[in-house]
């Protein structure tokens, strides 16, 4: 099994934020499946948590890149979220509980929702201006 967050995503001609949203939803779904079938095998829990951690490590590396055009406050928020997720993941591994997964699931789903709304907005703007979607 690969731990690449984008391995299963259809990356052909998809904007970055749509791929990121899809990866967040898939990771949240995986965590939710573990929560609904509690208690999971320790290996399955650790694999899902590691996948989520790697996804957030990717986001962290992206916002730390000087070439990233996001505003500083958004970069800082993502940076802080990533660190919170790393700490919370460690706490889950130390003391696993089904309810502790809710925080990670909710963060991923809310960020994915925002990314999808951004994609929709960009597509609508491009359609209004007669340009291609970005």
Predicted regions: what they are:
Residues 1-65, 69, 76-134:
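N-terminal intrinsically disordered, cationic/polar leader segments
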């Amino acid at each position: 099994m690969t731990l690449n967050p984008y391995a299963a995503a259809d990356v052909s001609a998809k904007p970055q934020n749509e791929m990121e949203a899809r990866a967040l939803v898939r990771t949240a779904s995986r965590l939710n499946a573990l929560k609904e079938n509690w208690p999971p095998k320790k290996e399955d829990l650790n694999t899902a948590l590691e996948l989520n951690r790697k996804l957030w490590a990717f986001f962290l590396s992206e916002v730390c890149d000087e070439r990233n055009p996001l505003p500083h406050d958004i970069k800082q928020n993502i940076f802080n979220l990533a660190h919170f997720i790393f700490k919370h993941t460690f706490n889950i591994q130390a003391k696993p509980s089904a309810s502790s997964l809710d925080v990670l699931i909710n963060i991923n789903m809310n960020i994915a929702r925002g990314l999808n709304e951004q994609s929709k907005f960009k597509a609508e703007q491009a359609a209004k201006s007669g340009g291609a979607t970005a």
